[in-house]
Amino acid sequence: MSLLCLADFKAQAQKQLSKTSWDFIEGEADDGITYNDNLAAFRRIRLRPRYLRDVSKIDTRTTIQGQEINAPICISPTAFHSIAWADGEKSTAKAAQKANICYVISSYASYTVEDIVAAAPGGLHWFQLYVQPDWDINKQMVQRIEALGFKALVVTVDAPVLGNRRGNKRSLLDLEANIKLKDLRSPGESKSGLPTPLSMPSSSSCWNDLPLLQSMTRLPIILKGILTKEDAELAVKHNIRGIIVSNHGGRQLDEVPASIDALREVVAAVNGKIEVYMDGGVRTGNDVLKALALGARCIFLGRPIIWGLACKGEDGVKEVLDILKEELHTCMALSGCRSVAEISPDLIQFSRL
């Protein structure tokens, strides 16, 4: 069977994965309203193409935090890739390196950051951190990723507690009891070489903690999970270098805005002072184009990467990235945009938003 679009990969991945694994990957919070709206919100947006322009050459390249990538399509931090493919994040990293895009490696990866970077030593890697109550763990993790050449630290802010994911409960998947970590261990635990039980983020983290984290690293800090003007303005005030507009794929608090709907508010609030990215609901090249037109520097993909991994491992992830890049290339040509720099809000029919 030919897999021609991301929806094809989703259908095939569901056939290949166990129900427990599928429920974990696809799991949404509560009634799944935000999960579904992430997808539906893109369908509500219409494009205003411009014609009679020379689009014989299309350039999808852009930069994020000063690093060039081949397309504004990167990989979000998602946990436990070995659920989908034995080599897990190592295969994902190899595909990202071949595509020359950024891969944000999760705190809850199946392999250590050392193993993942060794598999793709030339890749552009950011690290996603769930701030831990034990600051020695945070400091140790920052030191490790700096030594490995990571280019940014992504702090997830929308998970002070785990969302109410009914699918996981129905599958009897107890994350804290059954999943072991390779990375987030205290210095004492790490000497044993044994995985440690899943460590949940600190529920007491606040804006006042950011200066301490900034004092530990030279890396730019990106906040993932911002949805409002107020928090975006606070991010700028605290010298944060970027924001990923995200609702955690609808896995945390249900009934919050779709990421693409929140994007305009955040972009307006930062007023060009820092870079803004988004994830949540991107499934086609049209979706990428809409996000860029509304001010995202690039988009990040979550679940579709796992679908590709489940279907074909490294090759599947690369195919997912290639399909989306090719779709974006086509959409740019059909809308009159020769480069990412030419994608602007003028492409969006605001009267229908």
Swiss-Prot record:
Superkingdom, taxonomy of origin: Eukaryota
Pfam families referenced in this protein's UniProt entry, alphabetically: FMN_dh (PF01070)
Gene Ontology molecular function: any one: (S)-2-hydroxy-acid oxidase activity
InterPro entries named in the record: Aldolase_TIM, Alpha-hydoxy_acid_DH_FMN, FMN-dep_DH, FMN_HAD, FMN_hydac_DH_AS
Biological or metabolic pathway of the protein: Lipid metabolism; fatty acid metabolism
Binding, FMN: 77-79, 106, 128, 156, 224, 279-283, 302-303
GO BP terms in the entry: fatty acid oxidation
Chain positions with Phosphoserine modification: 171
Active-site residues annotated for this sequence: 248 (proton acceptor)
CC cofactor: FMN
GO cellular component: mitochondrion; peroxisomal matrix
Tissue distribution: Pancreas.
Keywords, sorted A to Z: Fatty acid metabolism, Flavoprotein, FMN, Lipid metabolism, Oxidoreductase, Peroxisome, Phosphoprotein
Domain FMN hydroxy acid dehydrogenase: start-end pairs: 2-353
Assigned EC number: 1.1.3.15
Main function: Oxidase that catalyzes the oxidation of medium chain hydroxyacids such as 2-hydroxyoctanoate, to the correspondong 2-oxoacids. Its role in the oxidation of 2-hydroxy fatty acids may contribute to the general pathway of fatty acid alpha-oxidation. Active in vitro with the artificial electron acceptor 2,6-dichlorophenolindophenol (DCIP), but O2 is believed to be the physiological electron acceptor, leading to the production of H2O2. Is not active on glycolate, glyoxylate, L-lactate, 2-hydroxybutanoate and 2-hydroxyhexadecanoate.
Protein name as it appears in the record: 2-Hydroxyacid oxidase 2
